[in-house]
Amino acid sequence: MTRHDPNRVIRPPVGPELTCRSWLTEAPLRMLMNNLHPDVAENPAELVVYGGVGRAARDWESYDRIVETLRRLGDDETLLVQSGKPVGVFRTHADAPRVLIANSNLVPKWATWEHFNELDRKGLAMYGQMTAGSWIYIGTQGIVQGTYETFVEMGRQHYGGDLSGRWLLTAGLGGMGGAQPLAAVMAGASCLAIECQPSRIEMRLRTGYLDHAAQTLDEALEIIERSCREKRPVSVGLVGNACEVLPQILERGVLPDLLTDQTSAHDPVNGYLPKGWSLERWAAMREQAPDQVEEAARASMAEHVQAMLAFRKAGVPTVDYGNNIRQVAKDAGVTDAFDFPGFVPAYIRPLFCRGIGPFRWAALSGDPDDIFRTDAKVKELIPDNPHLHNWLDMAGERIRFQGLPARICWVGLGDRHRLGLAFNEMVAKGELKAPVVIGRDHLDSGSVASPNRETEAMRDGSDAVSDWPLLNALLNTASGATWVSLHHGGGVGMGYSQHAGMVIVCDGTEAAARRIERVLWNDPASGVMRHADAGYDIALSVAREKGLDLPGILG
């Protein structure tokens, strides 16, 4: 089993020429490769895409076999992938998914990092995160709009909708956390982001998600103070350990206007640098004594959360951004760790009740112009949404593409299928240079059960019920998605989440149009169903408005 190969540089084919037997297999091939593009993946030599050790394939041998199999796969066959390893090809039918993926799933009693890491070391499992192992990661852009929407809502709730002259304090500039600086600036606030790995700060500078790198805390705070005084939002990255820097800021009596965190706290071995440790010691100890790393990291996270609680008590709006750091701190003895809320119940759930979530698409042509053309089509089809238009304008100006050109755009039930059909028609008419794929994050309205994140504090207490993502995956399979995935542990770590993903290809055919209409209606509708079942009035109203047939819910 080979997991480290620095000589591998993966880039997807681009343009209209096929390297597989059809676009339904070419698309997953290109998106798998795109996940490992050097401008996309956090550590491509080890197949790590983002989120600690979220991989695209179990090992390089498995990657090669997946590629070989996709190149020969027929239009009536389906490839099964088990934790990043291709395990079977079966005869199905033309409207069935071409790939079905299951990653990191464990029987609940054994769903712990300890058991998973043992399997991982034996080469029997792979952590798929959310979009790493499901081949629809589009770089940091994938989370930018969700982060932007969260910050805008924080500004609306706490500062009258105006974040000018305000600043956000956070930590973590990995694949997900790296969206925070740009999202904050787009929302009108400055941002100070602490990151322990200099390479991540360098990557965010290179890809345009970060404006400045500060060498000291004094320098960072000086830049922030000046930007707030001038009401010119900027983002600053500071090399440091959050559990050490946050208390230092507290000691100075400096208070941010908003506080959150996106360190990889979900993985206490691979994701969080213990207090006082060097990166070199951390890397060595992960190999030699992972139990000691975990113990030290958990204690450090407890101190981190205690500092966040102190900021909250000083009046700073504080929110958990879904990395499970509160749970780790509570387990370590911080009894009031959950005194500040998660971002979904605090700011995002009303969108989920409407089936609105992180709709995304990528241009298989590799041509940015295809994305700009689809941006214009979105505006044409949804003309009366100035907030959405503003987002698309900002994205076009500020977001640099990583790997295949792509776009993230939060839309919901009633709009997703219309956009998909329009994109498919654009391919059919030759307005786009090649097909596009449409997918989403697993963080969506009906596709995840995560009691410390997406389903925290559900109205009916159904936070931990994971039937919903299973039903979502089954429904998308039956509806004809091109590939469907079912994962465990994404975002918050082993034992704390189950979630499903789907991707569908717009290749310009009538058959694709039929699949698109089914999938892109049913997928967000399942989210409205899930929230209606939990008793949310918004979801119940949307379900009636859209004519959803929910016999056990609407009566």
Swiss-Prot record:
NAD(+) binds at residues 51-52, 129, 175-177, 195, 200, 241-242, 262-266, 272-273, 321, 491. Coiled coil: none annotated. It is found in: Cytoplasm. InterPro entries: Urocanase, Urocanase-like, Urocanase_C, Urocanase_central_sf, Urocanase_CS, Urocanase_N, Urocanase_Rossmann-like, Urocanase_sf. The active site is at C409. It holds the Pfam family Urocanase. Disulfide bonds: none annotated. SUPFAM superfamilies: Urocanase. Its cofactor is NAD(+). It catalyses: 4-imidazolone-5-propanoate = trans-urocanate + H2O. One of its GO terms (cellular component) is cytoplasm. Pathway: Amino-acid degradation; L-histidine degradation into L-glutamate; N-formimidoyl-L-glutamate from L-histidine: step 2/3. It is an enzyme of class 4 (lyase). GO terms for biological process: L-histidine catabolic process to glutamate and formamide; L-histidine catabolic process to glutamate and formate. Keywords: Cytoplasm, Histidine metabolism, Lyase, NAD. GO terms for molecular function: urocanate hydratase activity. Its main location: cytoplasm. Binds 1 NAD(+) per subunit. Its EC number is 4.2.1.49. Belongs to the urocanase family. Catalyzes the conversion of urocanate to 4-imidazolone-5-propionate. This is Urocanate hydratase. It comes from Phenylobacterium zucineum (strain HLK1). The lineage of its organism: Bacteria, Pseudomonadati, Pseudomonadota, Alphaproteobacteria, Caulobacterales. The gene is hutU.
